[in-house]
Amino acid sequence: MLLILVLGVSLAAASRPECFNPRFTLTPLNHTLNYTSIKAKVSNVLLPDPYIAYSGQTLRQNLFMADMSNTILYPVTPPANGANGGFIYNTSIIPVSAGLFVNTWMYRQPASSRAYCQEPFGVAFGDTFENDRIAILIMAPDNLGSWSAVAPRNQTNIYLLVCSNATLCINPGFNRWGPAGSFIAPDALVDHSNSCFVNNTFSVNISTSRISLAFLFKDGDLLIYHSGWLPTSNFEHGFSRGSHPMTYFMSLPVGGNLPRAQFFQSIVRSNAIDKGDGMCTNFDVNLHVAHLINRDLLVSYFNNGSVANAADCADSAAEELYCVTGSFDPPTGVYPLSRYRAQVAGFVRVTQRGSYCTPPYSVLQDPPQPVVWRRYMLYDCVFDFTVVVDSLPTHQLQCYGVSPRRLASMCYGSVTLDVMRINETHLNNLFNRVPDTFSLYNYALPDNFYGCLHAFYLNSTAPYAVANRFPIKPGGRQSNSAFIDTVINAAHYSPFSYVYGLAVITLKPAAGSKLVCPVANDTVVITDRCVQYNLYGYTGTGVLSKNTSLVIPDGKVFTASSTGTIIGVSINSTTYSIMPCVTVPVSVGYHPNFERALLFNGLSCSQRSRAVTEPVSVLWSASATAQDAFDTPSGCVVNVELRNTTIVNTCAMPIGNSLCFINGSIATANADSLPRLQLVNYDPLYDNSTATPMTPVYWVKVPTNFTLSATEEYIQTTAPKITIDCARYLCGDSSRCLNVLLHYGTFCNDINKALSRVSTILDSALLSLVKELSINTRDEVTTFSFDGDYNFTGLMGCLGPNCGATTYRSAFSDLLYDKVRITDPGFMQSYQKCIDSQWGGSIRDLLCTQTYNGIAVLPPIVSPAMQALYTSLLVGAVASSGYTFGITSAGVIPFATQLQFRLNGIGVTTQVLVENQKLIASSFNNALVNIQKGFTETSIALSKMQDVINQHAAQLHTLVVQLGNSFGAISSSINEIFSRLEGLAANAEVDRLINGRMMVLNTYVTQLLIQASEAKAQNALAAQKISECVKAQSLRNDFCGNGTHVLSIPQLAPNGVLFIHYAYTPTEYAFVQTSAGLCHNGTGYAPRQGMFVLPNNTNMWHFTTMQFYNPVNISASNTQVLTSCSVNYTSVNYTVLEPSVPGDYDFQKEFDKFYKNLSTIFNNTFNPNDFNFSTVDVTAQIKSLHDVVNQLNQSFIDLKKLNVYEKTIKWPWYVWLAMIAGIVGLVLAVIMLMCMTNCCSCFKGMCDCRRCCGSYDSYDDVYPAVRVNKKRTV
């Protein structure tokens, strides 16, 4: 309880009290924080894992470490104020987040000093520090810095205090002079309800005055770390070079994260010189405070729990190399790192295009009455939406169709701003869409309103006037000025707290290029760097580069590719291309005594800044912009010395493409810098004249010149399917044979199954081939979306199924207008289009004059309007020529001109008709002669064919008879066997016949199966050639044609596929020596995808491909390094098995036994000379028919094209007047007739029809009555 007693814990609850005794006169002073960046070793600022630290392992962990790049300089020694008193800081409270790292000075005085000055350390964690959960750590000698004896201190006390409900004084601190006595106020820490559950104190020895502390909140505990005592001089150098790791100290239960921290200060009392504090007035101490961040680290521990070494995996290439290899001492070599990464380099915002629209400030401050509300239109400009949203004291904001947050971040086609005042009742009704006098007679919103209603407070006591008559439409206003004056004069005063200003913001969705965009903090365009961008509302991540080849349409700001991706933007009349960021793998060349060399694989140095993310650390950022970078075939190399004239034949750090990192000079690691690696050329057989072949040297021919050749290759892929009637084939028509065949069981069924198997093999093989030949297609449906003012109709032409359809006037129009149709030689339709599509109508008659074969023509039809026009012109010109001295007679010229042109039109039409009539007559007569001749020749040919066909029919009859005799012979032979043999002997002979035929049939079916298997194999070969030769370029020589394959074209052929292979074949060769491998300096080398050759008259080995002789230097890219120069030979034995010879047999005995009692006499009456193979010769007739057809084709009449010209003439006005008068008169007559006859009249009981000849005497019922027998009884 020592700490609580010393601090004077009180049970009073109040705001934060003062920390020092009232007798201390201290002047408050503002507390200023500064920031700096300190380079520190990772091992000095990381917080080790307390559970693994004593394992002595090297492993990769996610641990917390101090972010020294943004170190806070926290002053804790306010200056003295001379004899009038001291100063005290209003110390800052800083956020804690995950935790804090602190480096502090405890003391400055050596043991021999008699100044007795001190700078104790103290920190308090909490939130509000009033009735709050608080944790305090203090490092101060004796009694919280109040010395009990005047002597230098070599020990300090550690005070730990945790309270769940306490209040800490406002600016905690210590006195700078130790022997000052008690200076802390009694209520510096107030404990409410004895809530302090941790209160520990212990002592530690003091070695130096500087120490590092770290505080980490984790799982409801406060973990405390500390370093050893640090040297007081050259603080930053010791942090970056020395080894001062932190170790875990202890854990305090605090019940959760405490979000804020306040550090204690060291003050100088008033009248310091008189009281001994004057010896401590010149000290100026700052705490170095850094926040903790979680990083991916590689950490190596000692067995005592301290950190031996550590590396931040994202800090630099060297640090990441340690993490990749898992070692702090990897062997020399080139190692792949992760992909080029971290954060985006910057942000580009461009939103403003037009001029600036000035907001109506004065109207918003003093809005008009609702009856005379004010409207402002915003179009093609930049507008500050915050003026009407954020800058006004909002009472209520409600938006429709748009989020209030996005209102000031989007562009719109136009913005309408209506401003007025409104009272509370009308405002609620407007928001709830309740009709009242405001919405009915003053201002009404449309049903599809898109925008925001912003009601804001007014500081005004002006009267409030609304109209209550004359309804308005949405967006409309009162138009009667006298009524408006009356309303305004009758305005009544309302308390200003019940009247609000109303801004109605109506938005139109963005369309086109003239937009209203919000004011934003536009940035400078960052080029050739990976950035996030917001370009006129279009957001994304990419690289902006100036591009003069992109074309952006007029009035537009973007251009897109064929796939719809935005690829260009116009900013301030400059065109920029938008390209995606790149991501590339990075490699590092490592040597322990040299700086790390970086290789950006496959990336040019100008594109390093285009990586997806700009690196976090300073070292990675420097690598992305370093000037000492070199473009190589392998990529961009950074941080090396270029030696492109140096060639080495051994390389420990190859980077590909015959390039290598080497340590070109003897380097010694020092504390300041390391030499750089050198980039040189790598040739493993450089100066290989001493290289020896590993195998015998052979002479080979390598092509040097080629020619293109075409090869045809046919592959049969299918065969005809065969069906066999097994029983008929074996026995014919013999019933005795069929009986014997029954003893063979399922032989015929097996034969049919085998044939079915053949068909299945052929079908499956053909199906697989068809699948390989087939090409999958799909319909590409493009959906066009037309928004805004874009109109693509002119580009796309006619769309839909009715394109090109002729339109006609309706039947009603045919009834109302007269039509005249005449023949059009080709100029009348164009004349009518000229009249209809331009201004002026009939006045443009002569302007629309057409030309036909060099002659000016006009249609011969003149409408009444045109006739009246020319007549009045002619009459006026003639009549006025007398008193105008003949000048107006020029008006006759248009009349005469149009008359001549119309006569030309009649003449042209007549001439074309005459020419067409001559062509028709001549061609028709020619056609009749040729048709008659053709029919004659056809008749002769048919007669000849009839004679030949009749002869063939007779011969066919003879053939059928002879075939019948032949088939009967088979049955006769079998029947003869049965007639000579009896019983078993006969059946045995038949059995031998059946066996023989079965063997033949089995052999045939086997051949069919073999043929089907061959077809299947051919199908597989064809499919392989389609896949390798047609769909790709084969690398196999002579597989797709003869030579090196270029292109193959497949064609379907009968029962197969025909390939046309194009390949280039050698015509000339180089005769050179080659070896399978070379040995140089005890290392073996083999060629990779080629061969080593020794050109004639040289002693230097080279490399060339086998397809083309092009010797180049041997390099790492075309060479495989072997483990040794020895060759392993393997001998393969093979044995050829000779087929065994079958045993001999006496064929004559078998033959004699079979034909022992068999008669072989057969009456063959077949005579092939009985057939007359006559042929039909109709060549002459066919040739004649061809000539006739050609003559008929020549008789085609090429008529002059005559269109039908249709002219619609409207009736004169007097005809329409007479027609309307007639219709009106007819209607009046019908009505009059109906009224006079009272027959079906609508004036009498609503169409109460009666007989026209009936009685008409009736009376109106004035009173209620009952009618009986046509009499009325009241």
Curated annotation (Swiss-Prot):
* Topology in membrane: Single-pass type I membrane protein
Could you tell me the gene encoding this protein? S
Sequence ranges on the Extracellular membrane side: 12-1212
Its subunit composition reads: Homotrimer; each monomer consists of a S1 and a S2 subunit. The resulting peplomers protrude from the virus surface as spikes.
Residue span, BetaCoV S1-NTD domain: 15-325
Secretion signal span: 1-11
Marked site, Cleavage, at: R676, L677, R809, S810
Instruction: Please indicate the residue ranges that the annotation assigns to the motif KxHxx.
Output: 1273-1274
**Is Transmembrane helix there in the keyword field?**
yes
- Among the Pfam families in the record, one is CoV_S1_C
UniProt name for this protein: Spike glycoprotein
According to its UniProt entry, the protein's GO biological process terms are: endocytosis involved in viral entry into host cell; fusion of virus membrane with host endosome membrane; fusion of virus membrane with host plasma membrane; receptor-mediated virion attachment to host cell
Residues covered by region (Fusion peptide 1): 810-831
What's in the GO CC field?
Answer: host cell endoplasmic reticulum-Golgi intermediate compartment membrane; host cell plasma membrane; membrane; viral envelope; virion membrane
Q: Where is this region: Heptad repeat 2?
A: 1162-1201
Q: Which residues lie on this side of the membrane: Cytoplasmic?
A: 1234-1274
Name the species this protein comes from. Bat coronavirus HKU9
- InterPro entries attached here? bCoV_S1_N, BETA_CORONA_SPIKE, CoV_S1_C, S2_sf_CoV, Spike_N_sf, Spike_S1_N_batCoV-HKU9-like, Spike_S1_RBD_bCoV, Spike_S1_RBD_sf_bCoV
Please give the residue ranges the record annotates as the region Fusion peptide 2. Answer: 829-852
